[in-house]
Amino acid sequence: MNWEIVIGLETHTQLSTDAKIFSGSSTRFGAAPNTQANVIDLALPGSLPVMNRGAAERAIRFGLAVGGKVAPRSVFARKNYFYPDLPKGYQISQYELPVVLGGSLSFFVGEQEKTVNLTRAHLEEDAGKSLHDDFALASGAPASGIDLNRAGTPLLEIVTEPEMRSAAEAVAYARALHSLVVWLGICDGNMQEGSFRCDANVSVRPVGQKEFGTRTEIKNVNSFRFLERAILFEARRQIELIEDGGTVVQETRLYDADRDETRSMRSKEDAHDYRYFPDPDLPPLVISPEWVEEVRANMPELPAALRERFQRDYGLSAYDAAQLSASRGLASYFEDVARALPAGQAKQAANWIMGEVTATLNREEKDIADAPVQAPALAALIGRIIDGTISNKIARDVFSAMWAGEHGGQPDAIIEARGLKQISDTGAIGAMIDEVLAANPAIVAEYRAGKQKAFNSLVGQIMKAAKGKANPQQVNELLKQKLEG
């Protein structure tokens, strides 16, 4: 039997406010435990929450970016459950009336464009953190600790429809969402610090079946690589369980990266288990049309609009435009390079940035802002390819030297110092071709007998004789003339 995976994601995005969502405590990461929790975060008697306007403004920004409906009136609700790091015994969230409804996000899986619809995005407070590893009492006895610094940190939980059908698609969506919230400036996107965490709802069903299977939820995955591995394992586990005659149980599971498996955490609750009801301590969140327009007026150019502009103004493919608009920094870098080149050469800039620049950044785990080769220097290097000073092959060597800081990272100085200028003199190239043809009569005969590979072999020998400096286009043209003349 053939199976189909059904995936929906819930993403907890920590909002980039200086203060918590309902208190004035700092949200700064890394402080000593329990030094950033005030009476509201500790749920001391008589303390009352006050809404952080900045958190609401960031939610509006997100809603506009995904084409969702920003609710003119949304309500905070108490989500009741017990956990040691939840001081109040409930979490302040939104249930029936969230701040954003609907919307969608488009992204690429490979070179295929996909769109996933969003169900909602709602504001809520984060819980504290339970500490188990390397934690003990003064006596040395093992124990668990509670750090409430994170309690009350503002979250925007973004929920998709169950429309993804592969782990690769889910990861591509998560990456696109991560890029968007960082682009908008509503989240720092630091996954290691827990700023961007995904819950994956996974089920399987026979291909062609309309009804969904029983889903499990994989909680708090904070790595794209782990997200893919967790979904793949869980889908495989469910399929094997069903094929062996078992039944999938609705439950919450955790992904164990060391064992590359998911394991049961608890039975999955339904909404009624949380006994949601409106929080009597918080008034409804009222968002006026004027406030929405004020936020809209201060929005940056969105990735979707930028992709369209890159295709229109620079003649890029939809895929190239999407790759280059993955972050604001990368998009700015591309535009700076493209604008410094002659008209019609933007594709050269795109190829270099998506190729050598991105590969080197990934290898060194750097961001585009930390690239040693600045946009003007890369444009100068590409310019030397365009004017025939060097070949693409030599340009890659020059780029490596620029990245290493040789001669101040200036391509012209590196080309001059290394003697890398391309040979474009037709007389000199013709003489080298004559020598290679005279030394390889058998290969010449093969070409004239119709073997195209023989031509490539001759080109290789000519380039070797020229130490890679001969203009490849001229070599090809002159060689063909001599062979067919």
Swiss-Prot record:
InterPro entries: Asn/Gln-tRNA_amidoTrfase_suB/E, Asn/Gln-tRNA_Trfase_suB/E_cat, Asn/Gln_amidotransferase, Asn/Gln_tRNA_amidoTrase-B-like, GatB, GatB_C_1, GatB_Yqey_C_2, Gln-tRNA_amidoTrfase_suB_CS. Pfam families: GatB_N (PF02934), GatB_Yqey (PF02637). GO terms for biological process: glutaminyl-tRNAGln biosynthesis via transamidation; translation. It comes from the Bacteria. Transmembrane segments: none annotated. GO terms for molecular function: asparaginyl-tRNA synthase (glutamine-hydrolyzing) activity; ATP binding; glutaminyl-tRNA synthase (glutamine-hydrolyzing) activity. Its EC number is 6.3.5.-. It catalyses: L-glutamyl-tRNA(Gln) + L-glutamine + ATP + H2O = L-glutaminyl-tRNA(Gln) + L-glutamate + ADP + phosphate + H(+); L-aspartyl-tRNA(Asn) + L-glutamine + ATP + H2O = L-asparaginyl-tRNA(Asn) + L-glutamate + ADP + phosphate + 2 H(+). It is an enzyme of class 6 (ligase). Keywords: ATP-binding, Ligase, Nucleotide-binding, Protein biosynthesis. Allows the formation of correctly charged Asn-tRNA(Asn) or Gln-tRNA(Gln) through the transamidation of misacylated Asp-tRNA(Asn) or Glu-tRNA(Gln) in organisms which lack either or both of asparaginyl-tRNA or glutaminyl-tRNA synthetases. The reaction takes place in the presence of glutamine and ATP through an activated phospho-Asp-tRNA(Asn) or phospho-Glu-tRNA(Gln). NCBIfam families: gatB (TIGR00133), PRK05477.1-2 (NF004012), PRK05477.1-4 (NF004014), PRK05477.1-5 (NF004015). Belongs to the GatB/GatE family. GatB subfamily. HAMAP family: GatB. This is Aspartyl/glutamyl-tRNA(Asn/Gln) amidotransferase subunit B. It comes from Bordetella petrii (strain ATCC BAA-461 / DSM 12804 / CCUG 43448). The gene is gatB.
